[in-house]
Amino acid sequence: MKKYILSVLLGGAFMFTACSDFLDEEPKGDITSEGYYKTAQHAISATNAIYDYLIIGYAPNGLWDKNYGGTFYNDYWVLQDMFADNSETNQTSIDYQSVENMQIDQYNQPVELLWRDFYQTIKCCNVVIDKVPSIDMDVTLRNQLVAEAKFFRAMMYFDLIRMFGDVPLREHNVESAAEDVTSRTSKETIYELIFSDLKTAETDLKYAERFGGGRPYPASASALLARVYVTYAAEHQSKEHYQLAVDKAKSVIKSFPMLKNYGDLFKVTNRFNTEIIWGVNFSAALSEGWKGGQFLVRLLPALDGVSNAQGWENATEDLWNSFDQQNDQRLDVTLKKSFTYSDGSVEDFDKPYVFKYWDSQAEPKGNNTEAIFPAIRTAEMYLIIAEALNEINQGANEEAVIAINAVRNRAGLTTAVPTDYKGFKNAVLNEYRHEFVMEGHRWFDLTRMCTPQEFVSIIKAAKPESTPKEYHVKFPIPQREIDLSQNTITQNEGYGQ
């Protein structure tokens, strides 16, 4: 669900609505886009609108609008774990039950809204990329703003092609229906834009924060490139791109060291720590600032003294059992089957719940949280190095073992990992699973590292009642988009048949 009552103060009203509904809404407001982009402040406001869409989204009918909540508000990180083997829903919603049971179709509303979130964010990025370069302003700041837009455009398109395959490519701001692109563009063409955007971002992003947290750094672009390269390499069996992934990941690790304690990653008092290469700032949304993270509402079970803990999602028993119960220190941080109150009383749960985002000392009453969404962090860079080197060498060399052990040793795991190709690959996949619960990784990792047949077997083992299919390595194209395109956008194989 994308609805929940929050206290919200929305700033930059024109810029926010000017980026509104990418596919079928006309820009709103008294100032036309042609007459607006004249000053440095206009450029900054246009760029800030991107961050609004990442968090707030576009909800013209208020907080109960089905569109409420942006790209990273909740469904992004929920879908990637639920359309896999990590989580289940406790909602009565058919939409979420169908995701859990692998019976998803082209009418699924969470998928449709996420698609729209991606493209609405791209719309805002394209406005900046098209309009800001012609503004007479400080060149360094101008380049920085355009680089931010290119960073996020690359991120949105990368997730789109990972989830849906070929998708419409809109490289420029669409100001009329006649200019719109209503057919699917090949992933290969979109990859070229992603590579280009991120290389520009590496050069033109700056480390000095303009306002608030959550701005991408040059290393953020390098880290995202590492993620893109390892995915491209897996799709194309390209040792060259595996090596590029290794090189980019190494370049980031030097500047963003991992924390010593896994639990410290998620403390509200430790937001934007050295391990978070880029994160979504739910506290100061880089416009007027507001709280709105849904982690506690969706993931915490009902607890005495904790407000609005709904427990809409829980972890699977398969995920719980996959941890080293005695030694993996991430387990107690990430999942709980019971909770001990301050008076010593214990509440047991009938299933494991995700607790990692709750800083009970800083936010004892829960509800909407200031916890950051750690979209890209250093532990992933170590695992990318391990994964890529294993593919390059068809087995783990010493450097690959050192990389995976950087993550394992922090978790308290000291046993040796297998170094044969398949054994090490499974070890890396397990580390991704345990390290990034509810961080938007699992489905992406499974579809990158496993064959469709392996994907089906893994899901079926974790969820025996589910009906996974090999075509579930893609999500369905929302029927709304097919209808709006008058069927020039085609459906992915297996869906709607």
Predicted regions located by residue number:
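C-terminal motif of bacterial Sec signal peptides marking the signal peptidase cleavage site
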Residues: 17-18
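Short coil/turn linking the two alpha-helices of tandem helical-hairpin repeats
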Residues: 161-162, 168, 209, 231-237, ...
